[in-house]
Regions:
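A general structural detector for well-ordered alpha-helical segments in enzyme core domains, enriched
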Residues: 34, 72, 103-110, 145-149, ...
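Serine-esterase "nucleophile elbow" of acetyl-processing enzymes
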Residues: 1-59, 73-80, 270-275, 279-282
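Internal alpha/beta domain cores that form substrate/cofactor-binding pockets in large enzymes
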Residues: 10, 39-45, 49-79, 84, ...
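Alpha-helix N-cap and loop-to-helix initiation/capping positions
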Residues: 26-33, 98-103, 136-144, 178-186
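Conserved catalytic region of serine esterases and O-acyltransferases that act on ester linkages
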Residues: 155, 178-181, 185-283
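Solvent-exposed loop/turn segments at secondary-structure junctions
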Residues: 15-18, 61-65, 90-94, 127-131, ...
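Serine-dependent acyl-ester chemistry module
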Residues: 90-101, 128-144, 232, 273-276
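Substrate-gating cap/lid alpha-helix
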Residues: 131-164, 184
Length: 283
């Protein structure tokens, strides 16, 4: 009998992997974000094989490559899951090129150590900040960071989920109202793309691309964005504090996930109607 390859999964990353921007995250961050959604897909897949599935999300908002690939990596190696995803670099995009050497070495070391333990690694590159003109200044640095990540991953023949090349993120509807985190549409799409990259059978239902309405964005929305998001961001930079200070990972150790009828979404097999409910973590 064929054995399911991914009976346990650990997600490493920053706020993008923690799930910020997903619907309802500010009230309850559990079962939110692309990684939690991918864990749900994996849980449904495992159920088809009659296997249990466990998941941990070690991502913490504001963390850099160095932080993710030191403390988070050590915890992942302690847990020893079947699968690890690494989405890092968003908080390093504006770093100088001189820092790229150390980032490259960290990523090489991380993938090497994970592979030595027999852990499958899926690497995610950085986004192309093309959705809002003010971010155009970051486009070149984002491309350079993505090239760095892809280059190291290819050295180890590790699969890469290419977010940078996706046209979807040129649309405001795939971003939360802070313009730096994914919306629920973005998180769902990434989870499905990761499932495709891992050659899984299940997918989450997505609204057709052309049917997703663009949010209204004018002077009022711009002022609101500046007051609620930009000013606090620069305030933290001036005080040299991180949004992740005093924040713990939401799933510090492996927790059992299983397909459940009271799940918050449903799975859908490619080419079929939804039939298997999404996974939820057991407490």
């Amino acid at each position: 009998m064929q054995k399911f390859l991914y009976r346990s999964y650990v997600a490493l990353g920053d706020s993008l992997t923690e799930g910020l921007g997903d619907t309802g995250f500010t009230k309850n961050r559990l079962n939110k974000g692309w990684a939690d959604r991918l864990a749900g897909i994996l849980a449904a897949e495992a159920k088809q094989f009659g296997e249990p599935f466990e998941y941990a999300n070690l991502a913490v908002r504001g963390q850099t490559f160095a932080e993710i690939l030191t403390s988070q990596l050590e915890d992942a190696l302690r847990i020893k899951p079947d699968l690890v995803t690494i989405m890092a670099g968003a908080n390093d995009i504006m770093s100088s090129r001189r820092a790229h050497g150390s980032i490259r070495a960290l990523l090489r070391g991380a993938i090497s150590r994970l592979h030595e333990e027999g852990i499958q690694v899926l690497v995610v590159n950085t986004i192309n900040p093309a959705h809002y003109p003010v971010f155009a200044l970051m486009a070149k640095k984002s491309r350079e960071m993505s090239d760095l990540i892809e280059g190291v991953a290819h050295e180890f023949e590790a699969p890469v989920l290419d977010l940078y090349s996706l046209d979807h993120f040129g649309r405001m509807s795939f971003w939360y109202d802070d313009l730096v985190h994914f919306s629920n549409h973005g998180h769902t799409m990434i989870a499905n793309l990761a499932a495709e990259k891992l050659k899984l059978s299940f997918r989450l239902p997505e609204k057709p691309y052309k049917e997703i309405a663009e949010p209204k964005w004018g002077v009022f929305e711009t002022l609101r964005w500046l007051i609620l998001h930009v000013v606090p961001f620069w305030g933290r930079r001036v005080r040299r504090v991180s949004s992740g200070d005093l924040i713990d990972p939401k799933h510090f150790d492996l927790a059992l996930f299983e397909a459940s009828s009271d799940a918050y979404s449903t799975f859908v097999l490619p080419g079929t109607r939804a039939k298997t409910p999404k996974a939820v973590a057991k407490k």
